[in-house]
């Protein structure tokens, strides 16, 4: 992975976390426009969410695979840290899989992927917090 070799793993981890936080916040703004009237019908928020999603689509699987390989010894014993990491991995993949049809067809057309995407957003947020505060 040539791209990965240019970054220190810590820098890439921070980029992943920042993109997750941005995507979670912008997704909530887009999902609940009645709570944020100033963001209603904001094409800037939508475009930034889409572009950050493309970044996440490329970076997340690459970083996840390297992170899993780097911590393979820890994965052999079950802990809260391992469980939250597994939940992060699968919710991130689910967000990618459910986000692609939403991008192609729109959120007004596809109710089921929209609900899955929204639910996985909260799952990812919770697992990020849990992973951060779990004992290493």
Predicted regions and their residues:
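Membrane-embedded alpha-helical bundles that constitute the cytochrome b-like, heme-associated redox core
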Residues: 1-136
């Amino acid at each position: 992975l040539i791209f990965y070799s240019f970054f220190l793993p810590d820098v890439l981890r921070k980029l992943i976390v920042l993109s997750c936080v941005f995507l979670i916040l912008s997704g909530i703004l887009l999902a609940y426009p009645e709570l944020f009237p100033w963001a209603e019908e904001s094409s800037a928020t939508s475009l930034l969410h889409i572009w950050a999603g493309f970044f996440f689509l490329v970076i997340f699987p690459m970083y996840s695979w390297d992170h899993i390989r780097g911590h393979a010894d820890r994965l052999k014993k079950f802990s809260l840290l391992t469980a939250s990491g597994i939940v992060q991995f699968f919710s991130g993949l689910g967000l990618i899989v459910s986000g692609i049809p939403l991008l192609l067809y729109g959120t007004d057309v596809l109710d089921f992927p929209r609900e899955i995407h929204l639910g996985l957003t909260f799952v990812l947020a919770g697992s990020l917090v849990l992973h951060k505060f779990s004992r290493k």
